[in-house]
């Protein structure tokens, strides 16, 4: 915190001047008092700076620099409420980019010292937005990361809009052979792929209960909702369907904990969650999930991760119960060029009396991110392959076998930064081949989203 405080002090605009040569004068001028107060607060003489700025503010209540210095001095003296009062006054007086930037940092510093770190993060985002140059912008972003690490609360908001050729995961075919019969059945309505627009929102938050070098314990909460708007073509195919028929909502609470292992390069953790899911506005299932995870730093730029979990699903209404075991192994690293590469593999086994919930699934995926932008875009490419096998299927005696291929290209647009948030555009193409025509699908879409730049 001391390192960050010193950095904040250095940005409070023209505060570090040479000490006034007051010994030759009986009375210091306001400018000399201001200079001396700025030098005093940087040299750890908060009491002197506090007294000098008090006299300056008594002389001229609109003295911006005096309020900035007094806010810093009051904070160093532990008078956090007073520090916040003078930071607010400085913000009200500030005009121009440099002054507003300095006042925003003073507000963030005072709020953080008062324990209001989430509010401090908002003010640091404001400082990023109004920073006069890239260097000061980067400094405010670094300070944001520091405060975020100290904040027990961490909240992420998600929002995206995604036009899609297949919002309901319907078949790309118009007919399908069923039950082993030597002729095809026409697929109608919701059995076929319906195009439209997906609208997705979500919130996840974490409160850190314990934060030590050895252990971290977090309380978790999350909520999400995804709904759709059908295209005119989809309404012609399925006139009785509405986009909300395919909407999904979910909430969960959880607890997670991880421990630093000897050597300082590995962490071992566990997590538990309780959740509920709705589909089409109706309850679909409740679940309990228990998992464990392991992470290890490999060299200066690599990270290996492994996780295993068990989820017990209790179906609502006519939906059957299921038990789902899953395992995930991944490795990510930064290359010498600054580009990033991530590879992973996963295995899922779902056990249920219902054939559509009883399956095994294997997948491999890779992602590659470019360090240098191409034009205005920071690009990341993704590719995944998966196989899903149902030993039993009510439409055939041969079971059900699906193989899927998905490719994505995501473009982040950092030049359109707004308060530290940047827009993203993701192009998605996915196709599934199956031994049953009904389950052959394809989906082409574009997703517009927002993410934090730091």
Where are these regions (language model features)?
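Compositionally biased, intrinsically disordered low-complexity segments
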Residues: 11, 22, 60, 288-290
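N-terminal leader/linker segments that initiate helical-solenoid repeat arrays
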Residues: 17, 22-60
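N-terminal, post-signal-peptide region of Sec/Tat-exported proteins
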Residues: 45-82
